[in-house]
């Protein structure tokens, strides 16, 4: 059973099962993103299929029109799906790995005067959220929202997700200097207008950021900082399965829906506390 893997299980009425050791009842949806949902599984499968087949992202308004549900329900369904996409954002990268950080948020100059953030320039952007990404050439990508783009927040994530025998490529941002102690580290100097030097470049990870930001601008319009990691998960999953056929991507996702349940209360409380 999902409550005790050593327990016997009894089949009960109404497609339910009972765990002998804990006495708890469960069904095939328990512990998955479908647990206690009032939306039909047919609509869930349609929503997941649409997410898997839309290369540039799927908005809650479009899903609302397709399923005939409220925008709130469509948004919550998509957030559950995006959280589940995080199962493919845990890879350990080897061989040649590019890494780069980016900032997500609107341009300060475009804000109304009473909403502009003072002293917000360059890397001191107080109004933007830093996101750190690593991509293995001809392999997978890992990306996560970070508190800051400093060494104390970036280096531990590199050590966690990049094999110590890998060769890493970065730009000249000072937070990466600590990588020299562990990795074979090469730097491309963008401030000198150097973008490619043989195999030394960060073009793949920058391409990933470009696709991600175009989706935010063109599909989602506005993404709250508190939920940004869910959107990052979605695009990491898209990139890591870019060579999959849509049906294969759908099945790969469905094989990993266990353990990623998200309650609406948790989603809202997380936003309030962040």
Model region roles, listed by residue range:
Residues 1-274:
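Residue-level recognition of single "structural anchor" positions
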């Amino acid at each position: 059973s999902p409550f005790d893997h050593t327990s016997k299980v009894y089949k009960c009425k109404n497609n339910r099962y009972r765990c002998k050791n804990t006495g708890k009842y469960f069904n095939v949806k328990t512990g998955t993103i479908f647990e206690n949902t009032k939306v039909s599984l047919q609509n869930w499968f349609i929503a997941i299929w649409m997410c898997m087949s839309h290369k540039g992202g799927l908005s809650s308004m479009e899903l609302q029109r397709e399923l005939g549900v409220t925008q709130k329900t469509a948004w919550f369904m998509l957030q559950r799906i995006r959280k589940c996409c995080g199962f493919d954002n845990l890879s350990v990268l080897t061989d040649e790995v590019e890494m780069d950080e980016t900032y997500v948020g609107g341009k300060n100059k475009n804000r109304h005067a009473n909403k502009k953030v003072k002293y917000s320039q360059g890397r001191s952007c107080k109004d933007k959220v830093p996101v750190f990404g690593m991509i293995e050439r001809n392999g997978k990508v890992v990306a996560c929202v970070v508190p800051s783009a400093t060494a104390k927040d970036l280096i531990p994530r590199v050590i966690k997700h990049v094999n110590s025998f890998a060769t890493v490529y970065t730009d000249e941002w000072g937070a990466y200097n600590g990588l020299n102690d562990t990795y074979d580290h090469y730097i491309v100097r963008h401030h000198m207008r150097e973008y490619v030097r043989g195999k030394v470049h960060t073009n793949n990870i920058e391409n990933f950021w470009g696709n991600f930001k175009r989706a935010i601008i063109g599909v989602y319009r506005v993404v709250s900082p508190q939920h940004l990691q869910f959107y990052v998960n979605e695009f990491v999953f898209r990139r890591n399965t870019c060579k999959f056929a849509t049906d294969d991507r759908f099945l790969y996702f469905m094989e990993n829906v266990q353990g990623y349940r998200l309650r609406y209360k948790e989603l809202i409380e997380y936003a309030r506390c962040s």
